[in-house]
From Swiss-Prot:
It comes from the Bacteria. The gene is miaA. Residues 36-39, 160-164 are annotated as: Interaction with substrate tRNA. It comes from Caulobacter sp. (strain K31). This is tRNA dimethylallyltransferase. Disulfide bonds: none annotated. Substrate binds at T13, A14, S15, G16, K17, S18. It catalyses: adenosine(37) in tRNA + dimethylallyl diphosphate = N(6)-dimethylallyladenosine(37) in tRNA + diphosphate. Catalyzes the transfer of a dimethylallyl group onto the adenine at position 37 in tRNAs that read codons beginning with uridine, leading to the formation of N6-(dimethylallyl)adenosine (i(6)A).
Length: 309
């Protein structure tokens, strides 16, 4: 990928990432690239808080609503599409502003995406059964013998990552750490800088709560109704958007709207908390921003030529 100035803006839902990205794009003449696994899909722009038509008109946007909800996109598919977009932006000597809340997308950019062979469902089930039979402490001992680095870095209680590391090591004969170590970053050092929006938790939760009500006022129920009419497979990623399940249940007459919104608010808070924890652990060297106020002119946030982030 050609050298270019790239800004990565990450953070939990409702933290103000899109507003910051748009402000930067206006000031620098930059272009915004989506790094949110829900906003990649079309059909739910209000529910997923995708940029509005007015916002889209203020700066070039890429990979928003680019995929039909019937498709299931992976990190690998997003990385391939994002890399092509970043190459194009670089060729035109523009600033790329990558914004979103999907941590694995950012990790794929900054650490690369390991080309790990598929792990069979049978092996995943075996790993899960072993975990259930042994409990986490003993399972960690087993994993430590296979992949000591992974065992050391995976937090207590993170069952999913423990199972993944174990299954990969058994299925491939090579530890997950080794696969990742052999992988080169997609973005070259010195070409990007990273910012994480990390507002006070109480403030973030208030924003999450308020936003859901506004989404309903702006047509989120109509979006869900139209999507339900398509009869799509419920397991599709697009239908896992925050609030979708609860609003769909309301439309089926299973809950009142107030009950649906209360349940959606609780789930949104839990998701935001998980995002905050992930970015705190996985991007410790990125600059933290609690509020948009101190930024003034955002042109200064771009990395000087040749300077590492």
């Amino acid at each position: 990928m050609p050298d270019t100035k790239i800004v990565l803006i990450a953070g939990p839902t409702a933290s103000g990432k899109s507003a910051l990205a748009l402000k930067m794009a206006r000031e620098t003449g930059g272009e915004i690239v989506n790094a949110d696994s829900m906003q990649i899909y079309g059909g739910l722009p209000v529910l997923t808080a995708a940029p509005s038509p007015e916002e889209l008109a203020q700066a070039p946007h890429h990979l928003f609503g680019a995929v039909d909800a019937a498709d299931a996109w992976s990190v690998g598919k997003w990385l391939a599409a994002a890399t092509a977009v970043l190459d194009d932006i670089a060729a035109r000597d523009r600033t790329a502003i990558v914004v979103g809340g999907t941590g694995l997308y950012f990790r794929a950019l900054t650490h690369g995406l390991a080309d790990i062979p598929p792990v069979s469902e049978t092996q995943r089930e075996v790993s899960a059964l072993l975990y259930a039979a042994q409990g986490e402490p003993e399972f960690r001992d087993v994993l430590a013998a296979l992949d000591p680095e992974a065992e050391a870095r995976i937090e207590i209680g993170d069952r999913q990552r423990l199972l993944r590391a174990h299954a990969v090591a058994i299925a491939t004969g090579k530890s997950l750490t080794a696969w990742q170590t052999d992988t080169k970053p997609t973005l070259a050092d010195g070409t990007w800088t990273g910012l994480v929006l990390d507002p006070p938790r109480a403030q973030l939760y208030d924003r999450c709560d308020a936003r859901l009500g506004l989404m309903v006022e702006r047509g989120a129920l109509d979006e869900v109704r139209a999507m339900e009419a398509r009869g799509l497979e419920p397991a599709l990623p697009a239908l896992k958007a925050l609030g979708y399940r609860e609003l769909a249940a309301h439309l089926r007459g299973e809950t009142s709207l107030d009950q649906a919104l209360d349940a959606a608010r609780q789930e949104t808070r839990r998701y935001a908390k998980r995002q905050m924890t992930w970015f705190r652990n996985q991007t410790p060297d990125w600059e933290r921003v609690e509020t948009l106020a101190p930024y003034g002119s955002l042109r200064d946030r771009l990395p000087p030529e040749g300077e590492e982030p």
